[in-house]
Amino acid sequence: MKVLLIKDVKGLGKAGEVKDVKDGYGNNFLIGKGLAKSATDAVLKQYEAAKKRAQEEINYEINQNEKLKAELENIKIIIKTKLGANGALFGSITKDEIANALKEQKGYEVDKKALECDHIKATGIYDVALKLKHGISAKFKVEVAGE
């Protein structure tokens, strides 16, 4: 009996592979536990169509992330904060403040956990990286100025 593995099965194969197994093992264990489906022509066509759709979605996400990267690399956000007597910041600029400024000034809503930057404890211009999906990373400028 031929089965299409839905999940990885130790000692047999990985998800998406078609394997030839004994009828009892295929029907009772693999199909019974939801690890595989009987590899009929209809099931294989359905699997290939789903695989193609998933790849198209990934390509679309990559394309959107590349566009976002191109947009972000041309912007600079400004964060104004109070300064001490010697011109130093009170505390430091947090990733949350950067994410809020990016949303308020440019309209991009990002997760603060996706931001990568050094501790910002002085005025100046800093590079901040935003990690996007599929290994894409965008850098933009953050200017910290006193009020």
Curated annotation (Swiss-Prot):
Among the record's GO biological process terms, what is one? Answer: translation
User: From the UniProt record, which GO molecular function terms apply?
Assistant: rRNA binding; structural constituent of ribosome
Sorted alphabetically, the Gene Ontology cellular component annotations on this record are: ribonucleoprotein complex; ribosome
Question: Would the keyword Ribosomal protein be found if you checked this record's keyword annotation?
Answer: yes
Q: Which gene encodes it?
A: rplI
**Is RNA-binding among the key words of this record?**
yes
The name this protein goes by in its record: Large ribosomal subunit protein bL9
Q: Which Gene3D superfamilies match?
A: Ribosomal protein L9, C-terminal domain, Ribosomal protein L9, N-terminal domain
Coiled-coil parts of chain: none
* Transmembrane residue ranges: none
Under PANTHER family, the record lists: 50S RIBOSOMAL PROTEIN L9
- Identify the NCBIfam families for this entry: L9 (TIGR00158)
InterPro entries to which the protein is assigned, alphabetical: Ribosomal_bL9, Ribosomal_bL9/RNase_H1_N, Ribosomal_bL9_bac/chp, Ribosomal_bL9_C, Ribosomal_bL9_C_sf, Ribosomal_bL9_N, Ribosomal_bL9_N_sf
Cross-referenced Pfam families: Ribosomal_L9_C, Ribosomal_L9_N
Give a short account of what the protein does: Binds to the 23S rRNA.
Give the record's family classification.
Belongs to the bacterial ribosomal protein bL9 family.
Keyword list (alphabetical) reads:
Ribonucleoprotein, Ribosomal protein, RNA-binding, rRNA-binding
Matches recorded under HAMAP family: Ribosomal_bL9
